[in-house]
Amino acid sequence: MVFIKVLRVHQEKREGTYMFKNEFATLCNAGKAKADFLEKNKVGYFVSALMAGLFIAFGGFITFTWGANLTINGAPAMVRGAQSFSFAAALSLIVMAGAELFTGNNLVMAGSSLGGSVSWGETIKLWIVCYIGNLLGSLISAVGFQISGVPSGDVGAYYAKIAETKMHLAPQELIFRGIFCNILVCLAVWCGFKLKSEAAKLIMIFWCIFVFMICGFEHSIANMSVLAVGLMNAGDASVSIGGYIYNVGLVTLGNMIGGAIFVALPYYITAKEPKK
């Protein structure tokens, strides 16, 4: 019996030598499933990406509409805290309802290509399709939100002011805010591969999003809809389509670096068995 226990302890130590090996294998399987989904059902995949744009737009709308109402009613000091609680709804919908989000796929697909379950060509193809779907879903959501009349008057002016601020940040600010944002978003996604309980997944989503919102980091897909609403309520604000492309483009670059290089690559290295 003692000998068996010793063998079990030894085996557990061997299995624990390569941390996150099982979780990374699960991530690679998820990436392969996504690539197969796109290959076998292109329309279905695009619709799923479009839905992700809608879900993220919902998060942006509640975040900045709440911020507008707090500002209008004389409580601007509460804005950042309130917004930090609200945007977690967006990623919660992505994870729990299911949809294809570009920023989360920066982790999943880069990790899968590093792990060898999909090619880099498949990853880039999926990123492009997913990004276009997210963009279209975001723009449709923004137009519908504008037609609803919610972002009118002072609320619309608040969106325009937010858009103006975002469009005039320096390039390095946008890139690094994008990097830090997607490190946190992808950590929330990574935790989803480690955790079994749905409640635990939601808790980690909340904390990761809370950090990125409090710090004021930049999410490319969220900006697609929020900046579009700002453009449609421009007024005297210094906003433009060129500013939209400038912000979203640089934040996208930062998000890709954050997800692929700062999350996927480190966990790939950590989980990889060294050659004997």
Short names for language-model regions:
Residues 1-18:
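Short, Lys/Arg-enriched N-terminal segments with co-localized hydrophobic residues
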Residues 16-276:
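Alpha-helical transmembrane segments and their helix-helix packing motifs
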